[in-house]
Amino acid sequence: KEIINKLRSSNLRPTKQRILIAKKLFDRKETFHFTAETLNKAVNKKGHARISLGTIYNTVEAFKRAGHIREILTNNSKSYYDTNIKSHHHFYDPGTKKLTDIDYQEVILKKIPNPPKGKKIKDLEVVISLQKK
């Protein structure tokens, strides 16, 4: 019922495919990071109806627009998504392609430049790229 309400609040019809995608994303205790490709593999395991990668991308984009997930762009411009929608930052390890959450309070910025005229800052997220020592 909660999943169906989440879909409807995103202006998405609760089809079997969308319900399955939403369950993979939101029916868990822990938040997590994913790509459209890793989500595609997870929902297309044996025993489930096949869901196209296009449907995955469209549904993920709709959830992002609705504020149910966040998009994180890494330095290689790869899109990752996060079910944790609270303000926080990330470590990114390009070797493992893993993101790790950093509490928002852990990163202290001394000065943020003023935005261009007619614009305001909507959000600020820091992605710290890692490498081996």
Identify what each model region corresponds to.
Residues 56-66:
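Basic amphipathic alpha-helical segments that dock to polyanions
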Residues 35-48:
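DNA-recognition alpha helix
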